[in-house]
Amino acid sequence: MTKIENDRYLRALLRQPVDRTPVWLMRQAGRYLPEYRQLRAEAGDFMTLCQTPELACEVTLQPLRRFELDAAILFSDILTIPDAMGLGLTFGAGEGPKFAKTIQHQRDVDALPLPDPEGELRYVMDAVRTIKKALAQQVPLIGFSGSPWTLATYMVEGGSSKQFSRIKQMMYREPKLLHGLLSKLAASVTQYLNAQIAAGADAVMIFDTWGGVLSHQDYQEFSLQYMTAIVQGIHRQYDGRTIPVTLFTKGGGQWLEAIAASGCDAIGIDWTTDISAARARVGHKVALQGNMDPAVLQGDDAVVTAKVQEILQQYGNGSGHVFNLGHGITPDIEPARVKTFVDAVHRFSAPYHQS
């Protein structure tokens, strides 16, 4: 296989030397881009974009045409697995995701199939193959999945939640039932990510969006142990390639040492965690990804540039940092601010990498 032209992102994840800090954005393909909004309108709905490999490829490539990003990320959704398990995922206009069926009883868990990545989820693998070909080895392609805990919250609650009352009720009343669901999801996520790697993904990321709503003990028991099992099951060497794995728990700053012990290569951190302190705590074991508040992009160019410089300075000299936002970019951001952000990372990071 020919070498990726710009492998800065992969090298940073493995804490190898780079010439400047790599940068990409969570949700870099999305509603803040007018070309995305146009394509989504033409497609009719969000799931059509996800389930049509050519459209998913086009959306994935859109931000790379505008900005000098160091990685592409598969355009998909974390809820593809529960949808393939038969829960009936829909996205209403202006609404979040909703499931027609929810998981409430043991029989519901027992009835869940393990989706075939090249069967019910073939559209995702076809998208990976299509994108990988279109990228022509210019930058790496990131594959991803939701964490078992985060997927379970949607499957039990039936959609997005603020209180997480149903799943927490299950956690405290029927922990065995919840563990059964999480075990099944961990097996499915492992299979799903390995299939993405086989289809061409160069790195994978697990999004634990809702891990931060758990107590210290519950996080270890109901979220981290299942992500750790997935990390252990992922093909880290495939077809002559080393596949780095990033774990991201939003609101997970207190658990960095425990996350680093999972065996992952990198940890995503949000803006509530000090990146300098995070590096001091776990930088000898893992790379760090983050961690600018997406709201900074509401500021003008001077504000964005100053914040980029501040975070670079906080991280300090050497490799092991992938610059990103602390969560996904929001739809109200002007693309011009993103260009300022990306260009500032490249412009001001080089001095931190001079040996």
UniProtKB/Swiss-Prot annotation:
NCBIfam families: hemE
Primary residence: cytoplasm
InterPro entries hit by this protein: UROD/MetE-like_sf, Uroporphyrinogen_deCO2ase_HemE, Uroporphyrinogen_deCOase
GO biological process, one term: protoporphyrinogen IX biosynthetic process from glutamate
PANTHER family: METHYLTETRAHYDROFOLATE:HOMOCYSTEINE METHYLTRANSFERASE RELATED, UROPORPHYRINOGEN DECARBOXYLASE
Pathway in which this enzyme or protein is active: Porphyrin-containing compound metabolism; protoporphyrin-IX biosynthesis; coproporphyrinogen-III from 5-aminolevulinate: step 4/4
Recorded catalytic activity of this chain's protein: uroporphyrinogen III + 4 H(+) = coproporphyrinogen III + 4 CO2
Function: Catalyzes the decarboxylation of four acetate groups of uroporphyrinogen-III to yield coproporphyrinogen-III.
Family, similarity comment: Belongs to the uroporphyrinogen decarboxylase family.
Record flagged with keyword Oxidoreductase: no
Quaternary organization: Homodimer.
Listed Pfam families: URO-D
Gene3D superfamilies in the record: 3.20.20.210
Localization annotation: Cytoplasm
Lineage top rank: taxon: Bacteria
UniProt keyword list: Cytoplasm, Decarboxylase, Lyase, Porphyrin biosynthesis
Lineage: Bacteria, Pseudomonadati, Pseudomonadota, Gammaproteobacteria, Aeromonadales
Protein's UniProt name: Uroporphyrinogen decarboxylase
Residues the entry annotates as binding substrate: R27, Q28, A29, G30, R31, D77, Y154, T209, H327
EC number: 4.1.1.37
Entry keyword annotation includes Lyase: yes
